[in-house]
């Protein structure tokens, strides 16, 4: 049973509970996230998502990283730009976190193209 919980992001485990028990807080949090992206400052969407890719790589939030990579791709970021954002993590946060982030990126790209990414 411990192995099962080791492989699940705690955010995923608690999100349903939180949204059911604190719906108005969650809605306000979602609204804040939307406003930060639209009105928070001069950064365009591509740059915002690249920053989020780097942050979630550094924090090892795999579920968030997967979401941020997909949103970066949909905002027009290239595979190379996303990979660069992940590579920038190594000097500050370590090589293992970067390797984990690259694996998640490669997995997403492989899933979307059904081809091996090298």
What are these regions (language model features)?
Residues 1-47, 100-118:
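Acidic, glycine/proline-rich low-complexity segments that act as flexible tails and inter-domain linkers
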Residues 23, 41, 63, 78, ...:
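Alpha-helix boundary/capping and short turn/kink residues
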Residues 27-32, 49, 63-67, 83:
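A generic alpha-helix surface/boundary motif
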Residues 46-56, 85-90:
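Alpha-helical scaffold segments that form or flank carboxylate-/histidine-based iron centers
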Residues 57-87:
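Mid-chain, well-packed structural core segment of small domains
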Residues 70-77, 93, 105-113:
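Short alpha-helical linear motifs
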Residues 83-106:
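C-terminal structural segments of small proteins and small subunits
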């Amino acid at each position: 049973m411990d192995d099962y919980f080791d492989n699940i992001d705690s955010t995923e485990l608690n999100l349903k509970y939180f949204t059911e028990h604190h719906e108005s807080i969650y809605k306000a949090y979602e609204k804040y996230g939307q406003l930060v992206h639209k009105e928070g400052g001069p950064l365009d969407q591509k740059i915002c998502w690249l920053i989020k890719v780097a942050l979630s790589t550094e924090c090892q939030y795999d579920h968030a990283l997967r979401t941020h990579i997909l949103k970066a791709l949909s905002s027009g970021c290239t595979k190379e730009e996303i990979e660069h954002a992940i590579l920038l993590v190594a000097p500050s946060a370590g090589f293992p976190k970067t390797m984990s982030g690259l694996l998640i990126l490669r997995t997403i790209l492989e899933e979307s193209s059904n081809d091996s990414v090298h």
